Curated annotation (Swiss-Prot):
Name of this chain's protein: Large T antigen
Taxonomic source organism: KI polyomavirus (isolate Stockholm 380)
Enzyme class: isomerase
Region ranges (Disordered): 114-136
Zinc fingers classed as T-ag D1-type: ranges: 277-369
Length: 641
């Protein structure tokens, strides 16, 4: 032990182990105390990191030194065999003795000379009958020092793993191998188990019907191997390992299935465990949300849970009215059943909404505004395939076009000019003002344009300290509408006053679009972006010049009695929200504008819908609708009684 560590290092190690120096050299005691102190000093257990590092370095150095000393002693002991030692007292023995001493360290040699003593006369010398103690015999190979190298390619080398598997191999002594073979077979009801001899040790290979951690198997075996060595490994290649252990230097001792393990006799679940139960696919939910652009957690959850109903029992699927619903229902039925039973329903839907927001953010950054508008029109065309079905629906939408024509004779030119404004998004030329008295059609037209392009309506009649979160709603939106902005009392004394116009005056950077502004939402970091363009609607309030100059165009609205009367007599346009829909505005453009005005990607859709509209209504019928609007009658009086 004196050759292992220096005196100072030995003292440090014993102090860290909290042992007296009298215990120095008691390796089993030091080993037990080392394991205890590892738990005490480990940083994850609240210990001292420096003490842990010092303890590990000293103890590992001690282990390495002890091993090297043992190896040196064995080499020294095995230099000479007993049969090679000559008879003591002969010249051969003197020569052997001189050669033997050359292997000793220099500090053990003595070069002193002793004074000669007078020789005593003696009778005849008798040959000595004594012999030197022969060196120790060379030890046989000890297979317990490490796991067989021949098997390393077939086993897992993970030190700490929570992975559960079904195939293991245990390496221990012959005596414990007999015990563990029976214990493991009884404990885990092994589907296959075999015992193999390896020099003076035993390897036990076994397959379990259920999955277990390697640590669980190891802990069970340790209960029967308190002194004997033990190696427990998970197996990555079961048949390859078994096949190798049936060849030299291994010997098959016994196995519970005659004939052993055959490569083709076992099913994959026998080797790798029971087939994994289907789990909820969050990605499939996210794909559904992306396809239908759903950004509401609870709406997504409610929509997806309904797919848990069997497709053959679904009313929508049985009617065959919506092919898209049937396709989506069949694709998502199994996953919806799993979602229905899941305890993380909201988490899965929240992640799906995050995917939708991320996709929207990516499109806003990478696509041009023209591409974004084209993509929006494509989405509306897909909705039209489901909604605008049958003569009644088409007539209702054509009635809405007739009503908008009564609102403004050049409504199509107005919409096209607005779309150009939104697409170009030029600084200081990004907003229109819709101004007029109550019930003059401002909000109706603004909402239809908002639904046509996609965006959000904002209320800025709130206190200024609440504005940041209201403006944060505009994150990643194509356009916005500042709805019903209130200001100071002007000519119309009956109008209520509010903070809207004053707040607009403080949002010049937002309206101009020259610089990026910071937008924020709750639980989301601020993000800088150009505030989206849009529309401001208000009644007849006074507008300061600093705000008025930021509107590219002001559209004045007036009350038209015939429009109100025709709506009252055609209530379906309001009850079914047809007037406010983006589909009505898109059909208006299809009805009035030539195909060449549309993007090439959607011109085929425009041609199709022009043909559909021509099949159901001609110019004469549409003129009749316009006449009914002008006279304040039911717009569909000729068609619906």
């Amino acid at each position: 032990m004196d050759k292992t560590l220096s005196r100072e290092e030995a003292k440090q190690l014993m102090q860290l182990l909290c042992l007296d120096m009298s215990c120095w050299g008691n390796l089993p005691l030091m080993r037990r105390q080392y394991l205890v102190k590892c738990k005490e000093y480990h940083p994850d257990k609240g210990g001292n990191e420096e003490s842990m590092k010092l303890l590990n370095s000293l103890y590992l150095k001690l282990q390495d030194s002890v091993s090297s000393v043992h190896d040196l002693n064995e080499e020294e002991d095995n230099i000479w065999q007993s049969s090679q030692i000559p008879t003591y007292g002969t010249p051969d023995w003197d020569e052997w003795w001189s050669q033997f001493n050359t292997y000793w360290e220099e500090e053990l040699r003595c070069n002193e000379s002793m004074p000669s003593s007078p020789k005593r006369s003696a009778p005849e010398e008798e040959p000595s009958c004594s012999q030197a103690t022969p060196p120790k015999k060379k030890h046989a190979f000890d297979a317990s020092l490490e796991f067989p190298k021949e098997l390393l390619e077939f086993v897992s080398h993970a030190v700490f793993s929570n992975k559960c598997i079904t195939c293991f191999v245990v390496h221990t002594t012959r005596e414990k191998g007999e015990v563990l073979y029976k214990k493991l077979l009884q404990k885990y009801q092994c589907s296959f188990i075999s015992k193999h001899a390896f020099y003076n040790t035993v390897l036990i290979f076994f397959l379990t019907p259920h999955k277990h951690r390697v640590s669980a198997i190891n802990n069970f075996c340790k209960g029967h191997c308190t002194v004997s060595f033990l190696f427990c490994k998970g197996v990555n290649n079961p048949y390859g390992l078994y096949s190798r252990m049936c060849r030299q230097p291994f010997n098959l001792c016994e196995e519970n299935i005659p004939g052993g393990l055959k490569e083709n006799e076992f099913n994959p679940e026998d080797l790798f465990g029971e087939p994994k139960e289907p789990s909820l696919s969050w990605n499939q939910i996210a794909n559904f949300a992306l396809e239908f652009d759903i950004d509401d957690v609870y709406y997504l959850l409610g929509s997806y849970i309904r797919f848990a109903t069997k497709p053959e029992e679904c009313e929508k699927c049985s009617k065959n009215d919506d092919a898209t619903h049937k396709r989506v229902h069949v694709q998502n039925h199994e996953n919806a059943v799993l979602l229905q039973e899941s305890k993380s329903q909201k988490n899965a839907c929240t992640q799906a909404i995050d995917r939708v927001i991320a996709e929207r953010r990516y499109n806003c950054v990478t696509l041009t505004r023209k591409k974004l508008l084209t993509k929006r029109f494509k989405k509306l065309f897909n909705e039209m395939d489901k909604i605008v079905v049958g003569e009644r629906k088409i007539l209702l939408y054509m009635a809405s076009i007739a009503w908008y024509t009564g609102l403004n004779k050049k409504i199509d030119e107005l919409v096209v000019r607005f779309l150009k404004l939104i697409v170009d998004n030029k600084p200081k030329h990004r907003y229109w003002l819709f101004k007029g008295p109550i019930n003059s059609g401002k909000t109706t037209l603004a909402t239809a344009l908002l639904n046509l392009c996609g965006g959000k309506a904002l209320n800025i009649n709130i206190p200024s300290e609440k504005l940041p979160f209201e403006l944060g709603v505009a994150l990643d939106q194509y356009m916005v509408v500042f709805e019903d902005v209130k200001g100071q009392i002007g000519i119309e004394k009956h109008l209520p006053s509010g903070n809207g116009v004053n707040n607009l005056d403080n949002l010049r950077d937002y309206l101009d679009g020259c610089v990026e502004v910071n937008l924020e939402k709750k639980h989301v970091n601020k993000r800088s972006q150009i505030f989206p363009p849009g529309i401001v609607t208000m009644n007849e309030y006074c507008i300061p010049e600093t705000v008025a100059v930021r509107f590219e165009k002001t559209v004045m609205f007036t009350i038209k009695r015939n429009l109100r009367e025709s709506l009252e007599k055609t209530p379906q346009l309001l009850s079914q929200r047809i007037l406010h829909s983006g589909i009505a505005m898109l059909l208006l453009l299809i009805w009035y504008r030539p195909v060449s005005d549309f993007d090439e990607e959607i011109q085929s859709n425009v041609v199709y819908w022009k043909e559909v509209l021509d099949n159901y209504i001609g110019l004469t019928e549409f003129a009749t609708m316009q006449m009914n609007v002008t006279n304040g009658k039911n717009i569909l009086e000729k068609w619906f009684e």
